[in-house]
From Swiss-Prot:
Compartment list: Membrane
Record flagged with keyword Oxidoreductase: no
Phylogenetic classification of the source organism: Eukaryota, Metazoa, Chordata, Craniata, Vertebrata
One annotated Gene Ontology cellular component of this protein: membrane
Name of the molecule in the record: Reprimo-like protein
Amino acid sequence: MNGTFFNHTLMEQVAYNNTTSQDLGSLMGCCNGSQTVITNDGGSLILIPDERSLFITRVVQIAVLCVLSLTVLFGIFFLGCNLLIKSESMINFLVKDRRPSKDVGAVILGLY
């Protein structure tokens, strides 16, 4: 929930309660950050954020998150493929070692 939604909701509540405009002004001034604080030297304490640096920071965060996500996905994929290949080769190794028993031929001939 952002601050503007909160402030507009409070404004509407105050307006419906038929309070004076002075109460409305003090409510808006204390909550939404629009009230300026002036120091002894005449400067203001409210700093306007540099939107460009915020945008660049967000883009870098998104790029790093995408790279890390792709790294994890490819790691899981290649690990799964490697395990699949190893299990397949182990199955083939076991199949080659198995030889039919001599008794199998006798049973087949005995049935006829």
